[in-house]
Amino acid sequence: EGAAPLVVAPDALGPGLKAFAAIPAPRRSVAVQRTIAAGAELLLRHHLFKQIHNLGRVAKPGWTRFGFPRMYQTDALEIVLLLIELGYRDPRMNEAIELVRSRRCPDGRWLLQDTLNGSFLVDVEQKGEPSKWITLNALRVLQDGGLVAVERS
């Protein structure tokens, strides 16, 4: 309704979209619903972590390093999980889901690849070691997201 088009850097969308997603669905205003949809579509156009003008390249290398807690930063794991939780199932999510699958270690766990250790009183987990939080989120993505079938016409 006369609102300006969404112009925002995709890496700034993660924290904002997370905040809007925290609002229970029945309590989301029409404006919040539209904002979620616009933000999700922008991320999907980027295949969640790619450059929009070159989908063969990662937009930001840090997006492919899974971390916990994310705070103001984000990564492909957090974004794909967020979109799944919001009910999105789109073939443009497949690369991110496959990235998650590819990072699984032989023992079935995922490593903490990025961390804010040193920024808190206590370190959550050790970088380079198996992470219960990354593993939990990755398993949720693989269980709930799966690979979305691409429709052929």
Which residue ranges define each predicted feature?
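Acidic carboxylate motifs that coordinate Ca2+ or other divalent cations, activating on Asp/Glu
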Residues: D107
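A structural feature that tracks compact, well-ordered secondary-structure segments
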Residues: L99-R103
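An alpha-helical repeat/solenoid feature that recognizes helix-turn-helix modules
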Residues: E1-E95, L111-V150
